[in-house]
Curated annotation (Swiss-Prot):
Its cofactor is a divalent metal cation. The keyword ATP-binding applies. The active site is at residue 73. It is an enzyme of class 2 (transferase). Signal peptide: none annotated. Coiled coil: none annotated. NAD(+) binds at residues 73-74, 78, 151-152, 178, 180, 191-196. GO terms for biological process: NAD metabolic process; NADP biosynthetic process. This is NAD kinase. Its main location: cytoplasm.
Length: 296
């Protein structure tokens, strides 16, 4: 069977020796298969590869059939989110980090080659991961990449000081809250910051968004799962200096002022992730997060 994906990009975490070594090994293997390979600019600079085709993430998204991301979940988040802004290019994650929840292919040499060979031939399963976009009412010039989240959009307190917010869903008042913040998470992000704050785990294919309070000063504040078609408006009602901060997947911090409105809704783009044919999301929950693990 011929390869389904012929032009392959490699994107690696920068300044990490074991990632650079994996990129070089991966490049040699793909070259043996007769595939056209493009390496992301900074990734190539970290390796000893010479005379290789290089490109930016935007160019990769527009020119390649598939992108292989080598590193941890953080690197996968950043790269896949940016790639998805420019095209529908599918992404394969190889784990060279700690947890490897999103980068589902193990870096074991023999198993990796077999898995990659099958996926590049088209023998794979696919997950479509939804994203969120946000707008701050007085920050209309924010770059697009600073407004799109694959995991979550979080509004958090500075230096642990409580603040107040008011939430509307689809134009209707939902709730007020005082506490350390609020996380608005995708199903993908439900196993990240949102889970640590007590939120539920959502299947990545679920068409939902979850709102998770962070240390709400209330005995009856609970996470709320809503349709991902809903539009969420969050108003900052009061705070103690310094101001609360809005972050996108843990990056791009924006200072928020009293009475500012943050609008969050589903993004048009999705991240397409390729896995092995036998990939099972619930296996990942058990193996990576110890879900339902028998303790005694």
């Amino acid at each position: 069977m011929a390869f389904k994906y012929h032009k392959v990009a490699i994107v690696g975490k920068h300044y990490k020796k074991e990632v650079s070594q994996m990129v070089e090994t991966l490049y040699a293997y793909l070259q043996q298969q007769g595939l056209e390979i493009i390496v992301e600019n900074d990734t190539a600079a970290d390796t000893s590869l010479v005379n290789v085709a290089i490109a930016s993430l935007k160019e990769i998204a527009l020119r390649c059939d598939v992108a292989i991301v080598v590193g941890g979940d953080g690197n996968f988040l950043k790269a896949s989110r940016l790639l998805a802004l420019y095209s529908n290019i599918p992404v394969i994650g190889i784990n060279k980090g700690k947890l490897g929840f999103l980068t589902t292919l193990a870096a074991d040499d023999n198993a990796l080659k077999n898995d990659l060979y099958a996926i590049l031939k088209g023998d794979s399963s696919v997950t479509k991961m939804s994203m969120l976009k946000c707008r701050v009412d007085n920050n209309l010039r924010a770059p697009l990449e600073a407004s799109i989240a694959l995991n979550e959009i979080a509004i958090t307190a500075s230096r642990g000081l409580m603040f107040g917010l008011k939430v509307f869903i689809d134009g209707r008042y939902a709730f007020d809250q005082r506490g350390d913040g609020l996380i608005v998470s995708t199903p993908t992000g439900s196993t990240a910051h949102a889970m640590s704050a007590g939120g539920p785990i959502l299947n990545p294919n679920q068409n939902s968004v979850v709102l998770v309070p962070i240390c709400s000063h209330s005995l009856n504040s609970r996470p709320l799962v809503i349709s991902d078609e809903s539009v969420i408006d969050i108003y900052i009602t009061d705070y103690n200096d310094p101001e609360p901060v809005l972050s996108i997947d843990g990056r791009h911090d924006t200072i928020l002022k009293a009475h500012q409105k943050v609008t969050i809704q589903k993004a048009r783009k999705k991240v397409t992730v390729l896995h092995t044919k036998d990939y099972n999301y619930y296996d990942t929950l058990r193996e990576k997060l110890g879900w339902s693990k028998v303790l005694f």
